[in-house]
Amino acid sequence: MKVKKMLAVFMSVLSLAACTLPFSGCGKIIGNASDKDAKSGVVRNLTENISKNDSGSKAADKEFKAAAASFSADLFKYNYSNGKTTLVSPLSMLTALALVQNGAEGETLVQLERALGGLDRDALNKYMRAYCDFLSAGDELKIANSVWTDSSVEAKQAFLQKAVDSYSAQIFSAPLSSKKTVSSINSWVKKNTDGMIPKITENADRDAVMMLINAVAFEAKWETPYTNDDIEKLEFNSYSGKSKKTEFMCSTESVYLSDGDAVGFMKPYKNGRFAFAALLPDEDVNIDDYIASLSGEKLMKIFSSAKKNEEVDVKMPKFKAEYSTQLIDTLKKMGIEDAFDRKSADFSSLIDKNDGAYIGTVMHKTFIEVDQEGTRAAAATLVGISKMSMPAINPVCLNRPFVYMIVDTETNLPLFIGVQTEI
């Protein structure tokens, strides 16, 4: 009788499932652990067995920015549920899905490539290698990837080689149904999110055969920190209609955002490499309708048309949010269907196609804390398997539901995008 198996990936965590006998297939493979290791819960680090090759990289250009912006907008708006505080990391999810598509073929690959902005996987691998290296060159942002294979599994080396070459992934072999392995995975996640996400998975899964995990950790101080004199207590009017008095941080910023339906600002972090951006829909624009209207093109236009050196009187609440979600329904809305169907999914470049691997889980966890010192944010994905006259100061008081982002100021791409509906 065939046994149902699962692959898990991302922090985003993505879980692949499979109707499978022990793995085999074409191409060179990584060998199994011993029965003794499997029974004892030993985690073997196989990374040193795979030398990292220079597979090439490509700096972010107009094509990549358009693809990444489109993916970011779709991921956010399709995951948002009316009135619910939401926070996703397009960077974490894009990295995780780009990693897993290296194991896909046929229509499964076509759907993944289309959802990831239309770039073919070889091009995306090169873009992601350069982009992640670029983002993590400073001290503010850390990106980590890992592939965990079950001790009973022989994974194709071509897939693992790409994981190491393009994503600097660590490769582990362990009995994934063991509680000790779950503890090891959570320890890896906690370490690589600086403790902001202590766990990505709660229970051992006896059907799991592989987990691909991405972790992102961001921490930066404001370029101009707030002082105690900048703190004011104001009312925040939540989505539910309730009002709550909370601490607002008051400042004058110099980048004004406007798209006809919302106004906002950008506030730089120290060194100017990243910025916090917020958009407040006009009084007559419903937050749900505004989020539904977002697209990659609209996001790029908001930032490309930003009015610099235009004063903005900003009042922003301190806030903290934790978010956890399964993203399969969201990804289906984005056009990825076959990957989640045990009969249609084709992950034959990950394992033998006859093993019937499919994605069974996509777990995404995020965290953010914004205060007068700066911002801390983290994400984990597990996939199983202009010259102007002096204007009046523009007021932007975030005293009702608003959209916010942490933005890479070089590409204007959001690393995190969320909506705060309650305080």
Residues covered by each model-derived region:
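A generic structural signal for residues located within well-ordered alpha-helices
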Residues: 91, 207-208, 398-399
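Short, positively charged
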Residues: 65-75, 375-394
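Catalytic and substrate-binding regions of extracellular carbohydrate-active enzymes
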Residues: 295
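Non-catalytic, conformational "gating/processing" segments within enzyme and secreted inhibitor domains
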Residues: 33-39, 83, 124-282, 289, ...
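Extracytoplasmic/secreted cell-surface and envelope-processing proteins
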Residues: 106-112, 285-288, 323-325, 378, ...
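N-terminal secretory signal peptides that target proteins for export/translocation
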Residues: 1-3
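Detector for small/aliphatic-rich hydrophobic stretches
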Residues: 7-15, 19-176
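Extended hydrophobic
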Residues: 212, 263-279, 391-423
